[in-house]
Amino acid sequence: MKIPKEGDFITIQSYKHDGNLHRTWRDTMVLKTNENSIIGVNDHTLVTESDDRRWVTREPAIVYFHKKFWFNIIAMIREEGVSYYCNLASPFVLDNEALKYIDYDLDVKVFKDGEKKLLDVEEYERHRRNMHYPKEIDHILKENVKILVDWINNEKGPFSKEYVEIWYNRYHQLKK
């Protein structure tokens, strides 16, 4: 697939390690692309679960995907402030169908007050055993949790004060 341009809409698909489709987001607006990353926005975006349940995102969210890091970041913009949901996941690939990645269950939630919480550890351990995650994947994911926490603590990239404001403003310029 050609690299999407600013203002294009793409589909995002997350898979599980066993190859099963996990979740699909329709019509994510691309805000920026470069050779390693894609920044987009979901705003009342249709999400389809693997069991065909559908729901629509409630608030705008700036999404960040990278080709080298094993996580993606969702900055959820709410009236009371910005919170983050970070998925430990494979680097993304892009094909003619969608931006795709493998979701590895572990998540880091960052609350608007900066508190961090590691989520779904039991689900990760269960899937690691049942889907036979290689030891290399387990090691890579644990190292990427450390990188992610460093980004959070040092307000790097998507966690900087300006990031959400810059990209949310850009979204409003593009949607006119």
UniProtKB/Swiss-Prot annotation:
<dbReference type="InterPro" id="IPR007295">
    <property type="entry name" value="DUF402"/>
</dbReference>
<dbReference type="InterPro" id="IPR035930">
    <property type="entry name" value="FomD-like_sf"/>
</dbReference>
<dbReference type="InterPro" id="IPR016882">
    <property type="entry name" value="SA1684"/>
</dbReference>
<feature type="binding site">
    <location>
        <position position="107"/>
    </location>
    <ligand>
        <name>Mg(2+) 1</name>
    </ligand>
</feature>
<feature type="binding site">
    <location>
        <position position="105"/>
    </location>
    <ligand>
        <name>Mg(2+) 2</name>
    </ligand>
</feature>
<feature type="binding site">
    <location>
        <position position="107"/>
    </location>
    <ligand>
        <name>Mg(2+) 2</name>
    </ligand>
</feature>
<dbReference type="GO" id="GO:0000287">
    <property type="term" value="F:magnesium ion binding"/>
</dbReference>
<feature type="active site" description="Proton donor">
    <location>
        <position position="23"/>
    </location>
</feature>
<feature type="binding site">
    <location>
        <position position="123"/>
    </location>
    <ligand>
        <name>Mg(2+) 2</name>
    </ligand>
</feature>
<dbReference type="GO" id="GO:0017111">
    <property type="term" value="F:ribonucleoside triphosphate phosphatase activity"/>
</dbReference>
<feature type="binding site">
    <location>
        <position position="87"/>
    </location>
    <ligand>
        <name>Mg(2+) 1</name>
    </ligand>
</feature>
<dbReference type="InterPro" id="IPR050212">
    <property type="entry name" value="Ntdp-like"/>
</dbReference>
<keyword id="KW-0479">Metal-binding</keyword>
<feature type="binding site">
    <location>
        <position position="120"/>
    </location>
    <ligand>
        <name>Mg(2+) 2</name>
    </ligand>
</feature>
<keyword id="KW-0460">Magnesium</keyword>
<comment type="similarity">
    <text>Belongs to the Ntdp family.</text>
</comment>
<keyword id="KW-0378">Hydrolase</keyword>
<dbReference type="Pfam" id="PF04167">
    <property type="entry name" value="DUF402"/>
</dbReference>
<protein>
    <recommendedName>
        <fullName>Nucleoside triphosphate/diphosphate phosphatase</fullName>
        <ecNumber>3.6.1.15</ecNumber>
        <ecNumber>3.6.1.6</ecNumber>
    </recommendedName>
</protein>
<feature type="binding site">
    <location>
        <position position="103"/>
    </location>
    <ligand>
        <name>Mg(2+) 1</name>
    </ligand>
</feature>
<dbReference type="GO" id="GO:0017110">
    <property type="term" value="F:nucleoside diphosphate phosphatase activity"/>
</dbReference>
<comment type="function">
    <text>Has nucleoside phosphatase activity towards nucleoside triphosphates and nucleoside diphosphates.</text>
</comment>
